[in-house]
Amino acid sequence: MNIGVLGFQGDVQEHMDMLKKLSRKNRDLTLTHVKRVIDLEHVDALIIPGGESTTIYKLTLEYGLYDAIVKRSAEGMPIMATCAGLILVSKNTNDERVRGMGLLDVTIRRNAYGRQVMSFETDIEINGIGMFPAVFIRAPVIEDSGKTEVLGTLDGKPVIVKQGNVIGMTFHPELTGDTRLHEYFINMVRGRGGYISTADVKR
């Protein structure tokens, strides 16, 4: 099982580190920095990390990955998108500078939680996982969750949603040290639906 992390910008290494922690019990797991279409062709799943959404968008266009990711998703490739990654895979970004891929039927408002100095961490309850420490950094807000399945909310707003083979969240699970969401994604890749036994997961 080869999981790729889109490697242009943002929390690329942090996602890699979380997956490496899980490789001890997933010995078939290999990791790839995805920067070219040929890289994408060799992965079974993709993580699109947080960072700066306009920069990531421009680079996916420049390197031909935008359309390639949409195509692979339509073919069933699982995708995990965090913060800026969620903006990229959304249906409506509310930002003319970033054309969403339409992989999640959500409407997004960028930087809705304020500037970086106003970032925060709080516990949220996620279906299939339980209480989880969520780190919000200039996070977007999901204004309309459309046809997605809402897995968790904060103050009545969805913060993590799933639709088919794509899961997206407004926060940064890679910054917590808690590997459960990455294990959830690995189980999605394995076709187990994502749900995990929290008793089996070491934080």
Curated annotation (Swiss-Prot):
GO terms for molecular function: glutaminase activity; pyridoxal 5'-phosphate synthase (glutamine hydrolysing) activity. It comes from the Archaea. Its EC number is 4.3.3.6, 3.5.1.2. L-glutamine binds at G51, E52, S53, R110, I137, R138. GO terms for cellular component: cytosol; glutaminase complex. GO terms for biological process: glutamine catabolic process; pyridoxal phosphate biosynthetic process; pyridoxine metabolic process. Transmembrane segments: none annotated. It catalyses: aldehydo-D-ribose 5-phosphate + D-glyceraldehyde 3-phosphate + L-glutamine = pyridoxal 5'-phosphate + L-glutamate + phosphate + 3 H2O + H(+); L-glutamine + H2O = L-glutamate + NH4(+). Pathway: Cofactor biosynthesis; pyridoxal 5'-phosphate biosynthesis. The keyword Ion transport does not apply. InterPro entries: Class_I_gatase-like (IPR029062), PdxT/SNO (IPR002161), PdxT/SNO_CS (IPR021196). Keywords: Glutamine amidotransferase, Hydrolase, Lyase, Pyridoxal phosphate. The active site is at C83 (nucleophile), H172 (charge relay system), E174 (charge relay system). Belongs to the glutaminase PdxT/SNO family. In the presence of PdxS, forms a dodecamer of heterodimers. Only shows activity in the heterodimer. Catalyzes the hydrolysis of glutamine to glutamate and ammonia as part of the biosynthesis of pyridoxal 5'-phosphate. The resulting ammonia molecule is channeled to the active site of PdxS. This is Pyridoxal 5'-phosphate synthase subunit PdxT. It comes from Thermoplasma acidophilum (strain ATCC 25905 / DSM 1728 / JCM 9062 / NBRC 15155 / AMRC-C165).
